[in-house]
């Protein structure tokens, strides 16, 4: 198996390279690519860590060598949020970066699974889909927006609030990957049993989870965005996809093109397998609060998606 990270010299990319070197199955090849000249050095640096994962780094304008033979491509290239910016402010820069990289994926490794980390994910995934479609190689089972950080944050915050063991807490998160489109289904949160919340706790937790990215941006005071936690979420996602590609049945949350019930792309539980998404899993019964929140987010989510489609198609 080969995993390629595009944007490997950035804040997320370097942390992700480290985690993948430590966590990928023995025998996996890891290719690191970035436009920055430091990238081969990042590869040399992590290659000194004693695990059976082979790492090679590539720099420059052309990601082709990194993409050749890739089974999974993770794209974290782009600019990070600064204080006062929201994820949509990133669109103007990151949209073009994602488009250009996906054009290369379409020619070099069209059957690879692709995980988009670059924000705004609600929009960049739509861009990727349209570029792949134009190239005649789009397989909706193999394109993902990596939203697993929303799940990790939800589980962490719930465990902290309720004094639970975070390893046992499970919280589904659906919708999208920014602001009001992030919806933790706290009515379905459980440890060994269902976890109960007051209405006030639900409102406060939901808001904190939705604004957790901003919490990090502000705490870093202009020095970056959520890179380390995002890298861990992406590494977990990568391991899940690879398990699926080797025949294991794995459930993960991701932003995928589904049945269009709410919007063309929607974050939900999926069963991963040999072809990427093998099955879209039901989101279960929503509370009245959650149902209202889903209906309220749909216009935002649809507008985000349309922005990406129009960027490619005019």
Swiss-Prot record:
NAD(+) binds at residues 7-13, 34, 94, 117-119, 230. GO terms for molecular function: L-malate dehydrogenase (NAD+) activity. It holds the Pfam family Ldh_1_C. Substrate binds at residues 81, 87, 119, 153. GO terms for cellular component: cytoplasm. The active site is at 177 (proton acceptor). InterPro entries: L-lactate/malate_DH, Lactate/malate_DH_C, Lactate/malate_DH_N, Lactate_DH/Glyco_Ohase_4_C, Malate_DH_type1, Malate_DH_type1_bac, NAD(P)-bd_dom_sf. It catalyses: (S)-malate + NAD(+) = oxaloacetate + NADH + H(+). Its EC number is 1.1.1.37. Keywords: NAD, Oxidoreductase, Tricarboxylic acid cycle. GO terms for biological process: carboxylic acid metabolic process; tricarboxylic acid cycle. Signal peptide: none annotated. Homodimer. Catalyzes the reversible oxidation of malate to oxaloacetate. Belongs to the LDH/MDH superfamily. MDH type 1 family. This is Malate dehydrogenase. It comes from Glaesserella parasuis serovar 5 (strain SH0165) (Haemophilus parasuis).
């Amino acid at each position: 198996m080969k995993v390629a990270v595009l944007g490997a010299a950035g804040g997320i990319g370097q942390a992700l390279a480290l985690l993948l070197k430590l966590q990928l199955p023995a025998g996996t090849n890891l290719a690191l690519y970035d436009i920055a000249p430091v990238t081969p050095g990042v590869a040399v640096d992590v290659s000194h860590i004693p695990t059976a994962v082979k790492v090679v780094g590539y720099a420059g304008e052309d990601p082709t060598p990194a993409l050749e033979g890739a089974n999974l491509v993770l794209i974290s290239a782009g600019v990070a949020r600064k204080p006062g910016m929201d994820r949509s402010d990133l669109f103007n820069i990151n949209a073009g970066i994602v488009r250009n990289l996906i054009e290369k994926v379409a020619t070099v490794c069209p059957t690879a699974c692709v995980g988009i980390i670059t924000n705004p994910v609600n929009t960049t995934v739509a861009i990727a889909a349209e570029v792949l479609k134009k190239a005649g190689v789009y397989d909706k089972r193999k394109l993902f927006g990596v939203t697993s950080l929303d799940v990790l944050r939800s589980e962490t915050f719930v465990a902290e609030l309720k004094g639970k063991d975070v390893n046992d807490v499970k919280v589904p998160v659906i919708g999208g990957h920014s602001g009001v489109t992030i919806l933790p289904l706290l009515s379905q949160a459980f440890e060994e049993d269902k976890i109960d919340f007051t209405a006030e706790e639900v409102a406060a937790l939901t808001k904190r989870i939705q604004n957790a990215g901003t919490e990090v941006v502000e705490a870093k005071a202009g020095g970056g965005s959520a890179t380390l936690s995002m890298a861990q979420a992406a590494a977990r996602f990568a391991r899940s996809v690879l398990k699926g590609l080797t025949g294991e049945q794995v459930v993960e949350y991701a932003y995928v093109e589904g049945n269009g019930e709410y919007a063309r792309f929607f974050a939900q539980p999926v069963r991963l397998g040999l072809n990427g998404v093998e099955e879209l899993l039901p989101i279960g019964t929503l509370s009245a609060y959650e149902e209202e929140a889903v209906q309220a987010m749909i216009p935002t989510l649809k507008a985000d998606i349309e922005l990406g489609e129009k960027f490619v198609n005019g």
